[in-house]
Amino acid sequence: MDWSAFNLSLKLSLWTLLLLMPLGVLLGRWLAMTDFTGRSLVQALLALPLVLPPTVLGYYLLATFSQTSSTGAWYQSLTGKSLAFSFEGLLIASMIFNLPFAIQPLKRAFEQIGRDVLDAAACCGLNRWQQFFSIELPLIWPGLLGAAVLVFAHTLGEFGVVLMVGGNIPEETRTIAISIYDSVPVSYTHLTLPTIYSV
């Protein structure tokens, strides 16, 4: 087993989880509790990673992160590193790819909170932050846990986006999914050659 690839996948999953969950909570709450013009359009845009094939999404992200793009050139001028084929680029791509898996369970969890509960809390003198931490956060806990499991598991098994954005650089962008993909032809050869020779 390629332990360096496994450790990199674990690192990517944990960082994606830590950075994406607060963003998922904010966006999920905003979509569930705010009625605004263009809400359906925003939801459709946030769901795009579910619709686009991973390799297609990865290609567009790679084009965005490349040194010839304004985003990639800005990042390189700021850090001196290329965003494409780097762990940082892989992390950003993973967050974008997993955004719907974080938002949807949390949005549904916020929608299940009764408006009367929040109105009662406001009547008791609780401000927005107090309502969020003492009432909303405990009530959305099942949705939060579900979103965390989905994001972590989905990141751990990512292949298409990882391959397009990160490539296959050992100890930098080579995840366990890429390592398994690389080992399949070798394993297949080991299995088929004895069969051919026996025939």
Predicted regions and their residues:
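Periplasmic/extracellular loop-to-transmembrane helix junction in inner-membrane transport proteins
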Residues: 1-18, 33-36, 75-80, 182-188
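Transmembrane-helix boundary motif in ABC transporter permease subunits
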Residues: 15-46, 59-61, 107-117, 128-132, ...
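Transmembrane alpha-helices
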Residues: 18, 101-106, 110, 114, ...
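Transmembrane alpha-helices and adjacent helix-loop boundaries
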Residues: 52-58
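Membrane-interfacial helix termini and adjacent extracytoplasmic/periplasmic loops
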Residues: 58-95, 165-170
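Glycine-rich helix-loop "coupling/hinge" segments at transmembrane-helix boundaries
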Residues: 62-63, 67, 161-188
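Conserved small/polar residues in nucleotide/adenosyl-binding loops
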Residues: 189-195
